[in-house]
Each structure stands twice: as C-alpha cells, then as structure tokens.
Amino acid sequence: MNKYKRIFLVVMDSVGIGEAPDAEQFGDLGSDTIGHIAEHMNGLQMPNMVKLGLGNIREMKGISKVEKPLGYYTKMQEKSTGKDTMTGHWEIMGLYIDTPFQVFPEGFPKELLDELEEKTGRKIIGNKPASGTEILDELGQEQMETGSLIVYTSADSVLQIAAHEEVVPLDELYKICKIARELTLDEKYMVGRVIARPFVGEPGNFTRTPNRHDYALKPFGRTVMNELKDSDYDVIAIGKISDIYDGEGVTESLRTKSNMDGMDKLVDTLNMDFTGLSFLNLVDFDALFGHRRDPQGYGEALQEYDARLPEVFEKLKEDDLLLITADHGNDPVHHGTDHTREYVPLLAYSPSMKEGGQELPLRQTFADIGATVAENFGVKMPEYGTSFLNELKK
C-alpha cells in the first residue's frame, strides 16, 4: 500500500540556498541565491514558503523561522560534478553524473566549428549565446544569401543550428545536427542538447517553424521515473521535465509558457485522478532572472510563485505529498552569468501531517528524493540516495 497516492514534485529552477561545501572548486565561493535576493529586496515576502519551513532551514531577510512549520524541511547537497539543469535533475531521480555538461558563454571552440564546417561543407556564422529571434534578425539575411549555418547557444548546455528551410532543406539540416550531436559527445564539448532551428520568411519578418528537432542525451542509466512508468504508475512531466530526461519514464507531458502557466498546470494535475508522480520545473527563475543577473526580477518572481501556493494547499488531499526543491543555484548578484554551486532547499508537506513537521537530516545527495519516491510506490530503488519516507510522520 503506497503511503501517498500522488507525489507532486516542484523544482524551482536555480533557487539555491547558500554556497555548497565544494563551491570553491566551481568558482562560487560566497554564492547565495535566495539570501542575496532577500537582501536586495530588503526582505522577501514568501509567507507560504515560510509556513512550510523555508526560514527554518535558514533565516534570511523577510524569511523567518516559524514555531510550528507545516512541513518537514532541510537542505540538500549535490553529489555530481556539474551544476547544470540536467545534472541536477538526473541526480534528483537517482543518477550521478561524473562528467559535467559544458556551457559556452563565449561561444564554441574553433576546433569544434572547424570540424563541423569540414563535415557539412557549410560555413558557420554566429557562434555566441543569443535569443533565437534576435539572432535571426541579425544573421537571417546573411544565412539566406550565403547558405551558411547560424550556430548559437544559450545559458544552458545547448548547441542550436538555424537555417532557412528554402536554403538548407530540412533533411540536410537534420543530418547536420546529427553530425553535431556525434561531435559534441566528446567529453571536452559534452553538450546536453543539439537543436535544429529551421525558419522561414523574409528579412525583417523571419519566423521559426514547428519543424524544430532536438537531439538530446538520454539519461546515462535508468531513473526512478523509468521504474514508475514500467510499473504502470503515472509520471506527468510539466514544463521542460520531459526534455531534461529526453522523454524517458514520462507517461504524459504538459508544456508550459511561463512560471505562472506552470503553476496553472500544477493545479490542473491536482484536479486529476492519478497514482504516481507529477513533476514540475519552473524555469523562469533561472532563464529570465538568474542568468541575466536581475535580482529584482528574480525576487518578484519568487513572490509571485509563493502567492500561488494557497491554491496548491487547498487542493492537496490527505494522501498527497508535496515536495519543493531546486536543481542548482544561480545567484543574480554573483560574478559572471553561470549557475552557482549551492545547497538547495527541500520542503515536504502533506495535509495528513496534523502535528506539522520538523527538521530532516541534511541530505548528502539530491538522489534522496528519487529514493523516497521509489520507496513510496514500491518500485526498484535507485543505486544512489537514501529515502526519508519513514521520517515523514502523519
């Protein structure tokens, strides 16, 4: 008999809670995503997260301890060697990643692009982090006139290749992306995802077509999601979760346009009758505010998210469990534009916790979440991680 019929796992993308013990190895000494945002805002207003025990993990400006937190609380340390989204999420579901995925804030190395040019017979232009629409405005006309390939990246571990469908036929663009995928499996490039970005239209009026194709990496082993799916449990992936695991172990995928849309979809799944896992990633914190080093926007987004939690609390049933965590840090007042190596918060709440919660021991790996989910549903336990299921008292 499952202790909880439904588990709702929410990953607040990049919401770290202070430097990890190994932060120095990553150039991240002093990083503190929520703490620095709270200082910048002169106090963060997150009353619902505070009720769950956020301030009991650590007090910050505006975020205080409460005498009787509704849920259980602690922080988790990442065991894997990366600090990117895929590494964090894969570890949450029971895998360790020894080779970090690479990000390319200065563009890709010349030797990689030389090899790609040689193997495809087409010249490469761009080679920098950019938004997909802006790069088309800048280079779309040149691409059409020369038949070259627009290669660009983002703050994530991606290599994107854009070409006009009438200049580079789709079949050829897909072949080119497969070549890029092969080349970037090399450890020194290790890119999480290669994306074909075809477009149409005229200069000044280009649009990306729905013929996008992703060449992702499958997780390097079986995750708890695979075990759930194979045992006929539901695994509902909301936001970019399905992309992060390349669809592995997912039974239903709900796309999102924003954090608020993500919260809407979470409420939708709360209204669904299912047995298994609902897994949401809220990416705006990271993509719109962390990488852009915008502490004000980040703080406002955290407060907006917090204001949606009462809808979630209201719909949770006695045999539901809500788990809230993050996948890495991205301190908006830290140097650079990259993620930061931090502890992440963990909050666990169910309406059945009539006496409220208390502190859980510090988690030595994000995989403790996967182990807890696996134990709850009686599926094969991941190789890594220690379940805290029995520490959650009703």
From Swiss-Prot:
Mn(2+) 1 binds at D13, D327, H328. Pathway: Carbohydrate degradation; 2-deoxy-D-ribose 1-phosphate degradation; D-glyceraldehyde 3-phosphate and acetaldehyde from 2-deoxy-alpha-D-ribose 1-phosphate: step 1/2. Pfam families: Metalloenzyme (PF01676). Signal peptide: none annotated. It is found in: Cytoplasm. Mn(2+) 2 binds at D286, H291, H339. Its EC number is 5.4.2.7. Its main location: cytoplasm. It catalyses: 2-deoxy-alpha-D-ribose 1-phosphate = 2-deoxy-D-ribose 5-phosphate; alpha-D-ribose 1-phosphate = D-ribose 5-phosphate. NCBIfam families: deoB, PRK05362.1. This is Phosphopentomutase. It comes from Bacillus cereus (strain AH187). The gene is deoB.
